[in-house]
Amino acid sequence: MAQKGNIGVTTENIFPVIKKFLYSDHEIFLREMVSNAVDATQKLKTLAERGDFKGELGDLTVRVSLDTDKGTLTISDRGIGMTEEEINKYINQIAFSGVTDFLDKYKDNANAIIGHFGLGFYSSFMVSKKVDIITRSYKEGAKAIKWSCDGSPEFEIEDAEKDDRGSDIVLHIDDDCKEFLEKQKIEELLNKYCKFMAVPVAFGKKTEWKDGKQQETDEDNIINNVEPLWTKTPSTLKDEDYKSFYRTLYPMQDEPLFWIHLNVDYPFNLTGILYFPRIKSNIELQRNKIQLYCNQVFVTDQVEGIVPEFLTLLHGVIDSPDIPLNVSRSYLQSDANVKKISKYITKKVADRLAAIFKENRKDYEEKWDDLKIFIHYGMLSQDDFYDRAKDFALLKDVDGKYFTYEEYQTLIKDNQTDKEGNLVYLYANDKEGEYSYIEAAKAKGYSVLLLDGQLDNPMVSMLEQKLEKTRFSRVDADIVDRLIQKEDKKESELAKDEKDNLEQTFRSQLPKMEKTEFYVDVQALGDQTLPVLITQSEYMRRMKEASKFQAGMAFYAQMPDTFNLVLNSDHPLIKQVLEDGKTACATELQPVESELKGLEARLAALHQSQNGKKQEEISQEEKDDVKNTESALEEQRTKKNNIIATYAAGNKVVHQLIDLALLQNGMLKGAALDSFLKRSVDLIK
């Protein structure tokens, strides 16, 4: 005779609440159902091993089956089953209080509700309008029981027919969840959540191509590997085993660089395998590739807070029963066990890298370009990892040679120490684009590093802070003699007027480029140095680069790129431009410059006469005199600049020198490049 009753909850109806708060994550019901079946099976195996179960274990496969006609999804096991008393204890009594407060607290975290109070079974009501449990305990003399509930607090228990031990959970799928009656959808979820569960899980039969179509065979379609690689002893495994397992996890990925097998049982339980993949150009696309398991049951691939931030770029599997999986992420990040696990993983990764570096440096160097993004990310984000990694982090020069930090300091300290005692690390970001600057530095006997990685620029800033009396400078940040200044710079012998005229000659002909500004500077660089070159301020360039990644630096992002056009006043070509300008502009410039000198003298005298007077003591006539003189000065300066600009516009050498400097920096393109080529031919004729 059927028995009816109410499920023991302190709220009127738990099921609408479950549906409301868990609907966004409703697919996990299948994980919970299959996981429960696996648990029941493993408990039976444990009882058998202890001698508490004397019967035959037989086939222990957990079976998942669909009946689209009846609209049901069934999960069956041959585990320990349940008696009527156990159903009352584990199914009918949801023993907790303060449910409303709890739901308010965790309403944004679906997983916090399931599991926290053992509600795994009740996740089935997220997709079901009715759930039946047909079960028979393994205990001798136990009878089969059927429990039914339609999602209200009421349930019904009655005798059932079931010859074998175990449980069948029959889910009558809700009308708005019909996708869970599709074979492809169930296969997808089983592969996602159950592919490494510890008991075989079957879904249908395997198929083969026969008589021109796919036909079912008699062989079960087992969807999981009950002994995944991370559960095995590392000493029994070969490299190919690890590579094969990686291909199983990530079929479309390139072969990993290497891997770390985690296996610890104290002070916490943790197993797993972490792979170092070959990182492509976009770091963000690499994240969320570590899969987190609890006793071989997939939980999530959102592992922030469990795995150190920089190691979220790794691939692989972590399995631990000691991580509280069904709580909020903020709780995870403050959990003592999680912190220990995070530190342990960091240490294991550092130890593995150090061992590879020590045992096979050649192989390590060959993999460095792929490895460095992990190492740099870790050094930038965690001080404890920096302290470990500084001994195996490498620097690579433009010739492809690798050095540890200590080795490189020893290499350059004699020749690359400036007059202030700073060790200067010269570097290039683009070996081809900065070639002439690199060669100029090498001609001085300097070593140049190649820093072309995604995180090399922030690494430079960090190393300047970590290493004492150390400065990094890109090879195009200044002329080579000033990159590492060993003595006071030589001043140009040109008079101020000559420098001003020379600067205006070139400034007037510089191209107008969007969000780009040029400044002209005259320096005495020696007659063997190039006549013209372009440099870019190390500080401003770094600030603009940092603004792409760091919040609060939008000011620098909006600023134009600034470049310095450096004129070598010692070079014959620059001297020629200056002398030609004097000759060509003498007649026009003489009266203008004479007028300028007179106006400058007059303005100086006016300022002198007003010196020491309060503003109200200066007459309007005196103020007007100053204003008119300043206006006349500006007019004459503009006139002078126009005369020089007219001369410069017709001087092919000026244009050729500017274009050569732009070409050297990859800034000469399109019509400007075409004009340069034609002019070059004319000059050769």
Feature names for model-found ranges:
Residues 113, 131-154, 174-178, 184-685:
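GHKL/Bergerat-fold ATPase module in large chromosome/replication-associated machines
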Residues 1-180, 188, 195, 343, ...:
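GHKL (Bergerat-fold) ATPase N-terminal catalytic module, capturing the glycine-rich phosphate-binding loop
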